[in-house]
Amino acid sequence: MMTPKSAVLGLCLGLSAFAAAGSAYAGPAVSTRWRESEMSQDECFHYAEIAIQAAGFSRIERTTQSCYGTRGDYTAAIRCIIDHKVIFFIVAGPSLEQAPKYLHDIYDHF
């Protein structure tokens, strides 16, 4: 027979396991900004590479619309959607405090 004391102990253990599992499965911190732009795709990529490198990111790569870089556990991306006159700035990594700081640095260098 379960006593109230063992029921409370079981509930506490279950809640602890649930909290630990939630932390283990937490996703990365993602910080974003955007701005309108009239620049060309080539200009956007040029400034994107400069901004990402100036913020201390390396291993710069390009896709058809985006420029990426890495800095430790963080990834930065600048997506140039020139057809819609929009540029997206994205930084993802493990810290909710650091990701926005890196994003601000990249945005300011663009």
Model-flagged regions — what are they?
Residues 67-110:
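Mid-chain, structured segments of secreted extracytoplasmic proteins
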Residues 10-19:
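Bacterial N-terminal signal peptides
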Residues 15, 33-34, 88:
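Generic anion/oxyanion-binding catalytic loop in active/binding sites
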Residues 29, 57, 83-87:
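A broad structural signal for short, well-ordered beta-strand segments within beta-sheet-rich domains
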Residues 1-11:
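Bacterial N-terminal signal peptides that target proteins for export
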Residues 50, 56-75:
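A cross-family detector of function-defining hotspots
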Residues 23-55:
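Terminal, regulation- and interaction-focused segments at domain boundaries
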